[in-house]
Amino acid sequence: MSWIDKFFITFFYTKVGEDEFLNQYYESRNNIDYLGRSRRCVIYKNINESTKIPPSWYSWLHHLVNEIPKNVQLFPWQQNNKITKKLPKTSNLKYNRWQP
């Protein structure tokens, strides 16, 4: 994206939010598309790579949802203490192998 595109986006659009990759999302103030919806765009942090958009922001960009996504903090990893030490028996004692 050229610097002039970034200038016009920041001038004519309102900033809606940022994701964890520091991409900035904008929505137009008064420019609407042919379906009557406001235009939405993204300014990428580093290179213009569409795979760097999280699924929640992707659905917002393509008008699948109208709610602005929130950054959800994930919990840190914890060890599962509910795992039993003794494994259940897998052999069935009632089973007799067939012998011809």
Curated annotation (Swiss-Prot):
- InterPro entries on file: NDUFA12 (IPR007763)
For this entry, list what GO says about its biological process.
response to oxidative stress
Among Pfam families, the record links this protein to: NDUFA12
Ranges in coiled-coil conformation: none
Q: Which GO terms describe its cellular component?
A: respiratory chain complex I
Protein's recorded name: Uncharacterized protein RP725
Q: Which organism is it from?
A: Rickettsia prowazekii (strain Madrid E)
